[in-house]
Amino acid sequence: QGRLEALFNYQTLITELTGLPVANASLLDEGTAAAEAMILSYNNSKNKNTFLVDIEVFPQTLEVLQTRAKPLGIEIKLIDWYTITELEDFDDAFGLLVQLPNNKGRLRDPNAFLRIADVYKCMKIAIVDPMCQVLMQPVGEMGFDVAVGSMQRFGVPMGFGGPHAAFFACTDKYKRKIPGRIVGQSLDSQGNKALRLALQTREQHIRRDKATSNICTAQALLANMAGFYAAYHGAEGLNKIATRILKYRQTLQKALRWCGIEVDESEGFDTVRFKSFLVLEGFNVRYEDGHTLITLDECTT
């Protein structure tokens, strides 16, 4: 019961952050969670095989999506914020995925994407940063059907890339199609409240080849770490942490401008993008299109 209660706390955290009513007890990582969201939307569609993906999703996530899509005959179509007026390209789309903030650290208004998804009856999926969700409008309130992401920022070290628990939340409409474990509240034989794994008829140990997913596990340890991180800090503490990160970004932007460096002025949360001189000086930094990106967190000094 203690283990289930900890995971139930984690699920509650995810629903409060995303504004979506149903969340599972975690998945393996952000990339596979995005792929599971794609499969959910694909299985929910009728005779459509195109999945629209924000061109600025993280590259590792895009590679997982492409790998998972290929054997199913799904076409991944990358779309740009500036070319989404080409409505004729979206007739065969069953789902749309947006990253907030995106691969360049930009946090843009997704309403244009959401309008297109509504016109073509696509499922709307958001990959979100949970710490950013502390300050921004929950994606569920924006109109997204599914939200996925990584909980690494909630008290879990980077660990050379992993492991990190992923989250998966959705509207009530899809609760019987969501992948992974779900902890639910029930009553025991004496009528007392008790926790148990719920809606297990979705899973392959019961449904076998007709299961909603062949993901039958969770990153329970990492999910519990993230859940207790949130419980320790509380809502007010998380808000202070997220606000501090945002202020660090603003401070770094101001310092770079003062040094005469051209800074990307797009809205964002924790990442500063600027014209790079660091590569020429021999620094080992992320470098693309003549720009360097620096991402900050609560450990920044």
What is the meaning of each model-derived region?
Residues 27, 51-58, 100-104, 125-126, ...:
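Hydrophobic alpha-helical scaffolding
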Residues 45-47, 93, 146-149, 201-208, ...:
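Short acidic (Asp/Glu) and glycine-rich catalytic loops that position anionic groups and cofactors
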Residues 67, 72-74, 79-83, 267, ...:
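Glycine-rich ThDP/TPP pyrophosphate-binding loop and its adjacent helix/strand module
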Residues 154-259, 264-266:
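Active-site C-terminal subdomain of aminotransferase-like
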